[in-house]
Amino acid sequence: MIKQKLYIPFILALILLISCKDENILYLDFQNLNGNWHKNNEIEFNFESSESVVDISLILRTDNLYPFSNIFLISSIKNGNKNEIDTISYAFENDNKKWYDAQVSSIKNSKISVKKHFKIDSGLTNFKVKHAIRYLDSIMPQTKLDGILDVGLIVEKSNK
């Protein structure tokens, strides 16, 4: 009887968590990279959208094997007649060599802003990203970038 009484609040809490949805998040998806990102692996996300103004961000999950304190990314967004290509530079550390998104575990989640207040049209939106990190004395990107576990894309309604 006591066990049944304990299950009821647990089940209610679980139902509440599952039913909660952040109305500002229009799209969220991750792709697992199994700990390394090859330079030829262009990650692609496709989502349907209605006309709106959005904020687009990447979420990188890294571990202690990631050898750099920054990352360079090349992204492209195709929506309607728009096709925008950008280079993104992101520093994981501040001037004091502290990670911006430091966490207790060895896995770090970093949210990288790609576009703020971006107007998308109704229809299919295609987003692609690849890494372009290289050593200082090289013009070629790293063949394999260790320590990258997952790459995610989050599209949220803009506050403006």
Indicate where each model-derived feature is located.
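Bacterial N-terminal signal peptides that target proteins for export
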Residues: 1-8
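C-terminal motif of bacterial Sec signal peptides marking the signal peptidase cleavage site
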Residues: 16-19
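Start-of-domain marker
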Residues: 23-86
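Extended extracellular/luminal ectodomain segments enriched in beta-structured repeat modules
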Residues: 49-56, 122-123, 157-159
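Beta-strand elements of well-folded, non-transmembrane domains
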Residues: 60-64, 77-79, 92-94, 131-135, ...
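Short acidic/polar inter-strand loop motif in beta-rich domains
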Residues: 63-65, 108-121, 131-140
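A beta-strand/beta-hairpin structural motif
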Residues: 90-93, 100-116
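Internal, hydrophobic beta-strand segments that form the core of beta-sheet-rich folds
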Residues: 121-157
